[in-house]
Amino acid sequence: MSWQGKSVLVVGLGRSGRAAATELARLGAKVTACDRQALAEEELENLRKEGVHLILGGYPEVNELQPDLVITSPGVPSGEPPLARARARGIPVWSELELAYRLLPPGVKVVAITGTNGKTTTTSLCGRILQEAGWPAVVGGNIGIPLVKELQEIAPGSYVVCEVSSFQLEAITSFHPQVAAILNITPDHLDRHGSLENYIAAKARVMAYQEARDFAILNYDDPHTRSLAGGARSRVLFFSRRERPPLGAWLEDGVICCDLGAGGTVKLCHCEELSLKGSHNLENSMAAALVALALGVDPEQLTRTLKTFPAVPHRLEPVAEINGVCYINDSKGTNPEATMKAINAYSNPLVLIAGGRNKGSDFTLLAQQMAGRVKHLVLVGEAARELEQAARKAGIDSIYLAPDFASAVREAAGAARPGDIVMLSPACASWDMFKNYEERGDVFKSLVLQMKDDG
């Protein structure tokens, strides 16, 4: 497809929107980019240098602009006026993911990882497995670097491992991963999707354009993901911590075993040998193993990476030990399910820092889990009162409502004793106080390391 002279409207100027606008302008398209919010002057100047026409503080009228194509950013709800009007006029609406897919060099094989929790860890692990096996592989997508920004690094015939979100999958029209994995589905982003059913349907779209020779990897222990197998046109592999599925990965006396339907059972390693700890990371490791085996990675090489892969930043990331207290950064825990997995990954007494902006979640189950695990609960941000109510109903009395994030970290440190863990796992989004979960995690690490320096 020739982009020269094509009129493209980019709606939303977050990371992926800016990357899409820049790439399209370089390809010769006439790009108009808009956002309701203001942008930093440096970002504006970079876009202007590429010839992008900017509209800030609102949206242009699609009927007047008459673009050939609309690119939507993940943070823009699908019902926003320019997107709805474009669809009504028959103008294609793509996500940045769809755009990047269409711009890939020939022969590239795509692995797509989605799910409510574990996406980034599993995506990073899959990429590392391929790279350590000597395969040309690029990791990107929702993991932090928009895929369209990495196109120059992707060679013909190579591999792309991308983390994909429900928001990105809403606006795909041909995105075709040779291997797609849905790790788990629990209520999340319901403020955006409107219902759990809509959220599940968005996640399932990762398999929408697969073919019979492709692979879909699903969590057998999760009823939502397991139920999606019937709609898959590709070969389905399951992973399970509890029982042996028809085909896929399971545990046998603690050893990870895999059967893809040809070649018999492959035994990898004991789950205690995995570098990533916690039951949720066992699931992530099993999913990554199936991805690798489906692509043809040597089992011995795969096992070596499973045993040595380091922790991913902001996912149960050890920060420091101060006076016998271990500090853990789990800023990526942006929903109750993620935080429940985090607090159950350790047996030590926990001081938990939680709170932020609720994404439509119910905190009841989380509070019940905290009641048996958390010795002191420090709450901060917009959802602090809502979390406090759920916690008190669950019988938790040791609660502190912090006026700001730094106060929350100081309170948690003061409440901890040698042998305890202070964990940031907010169960909420970061947007009430920070740009993103990465910034929140970085601030937490900075505050902890400052305490260590102060002695």
From Swiss-Prot:
Pathway: Cell wall biogenesis; peptidoglycan biosynthesis. GO terms for molecular function: ATP binding; tetrahydrofolylpolyglutamate synthase activity; UDP-N-acetylmuramoylalanine-D-glutamate ligase activity. It comes from the Bacteria. It catalyses: UDP-N-acetyl-alpha-D-muramoyl-L-alanine + D-glutamate + ATP = UDP-N-acetyl-alpha-D-muramoyl-L-alanyl-D-glutamate + ADP + phosphate + H(+). It holds the Pfam family AlaDh_PNT_C. ATP binds at residues 115-121. It is found in: Cytoplasm. Keywords: ATP-binding, Cell cycle, Cell division, Cell shape, Cell wall biogenesis/degradation, Cytoplasm, Ligase, Nucleotide-binding, Peptidoglycan synthesis. Its EC number is 6.3.2.9. InterPro entries: AlaDH/PNT_NAD(H)-bd, Folylpolyglutamate_synth_CS, Mur-like_cat_sf, Mur_ligase_C, Mur_ligase_C_dom_sf, Mur_ligase_cen, MurD. Cell wall formation. Catalyzes the addition of glutamate to the nucleotide precursor UDP-N-acetylmuramoyl-L-alanine (UMA). Belongs to the MurCDEF family. This is UDP-N-acetylmuramoylalanine--D-glutamate ligase. It comes from Moorella thermoacetica (strain ATCC 39073 / JCM 9320). The gene is murD.
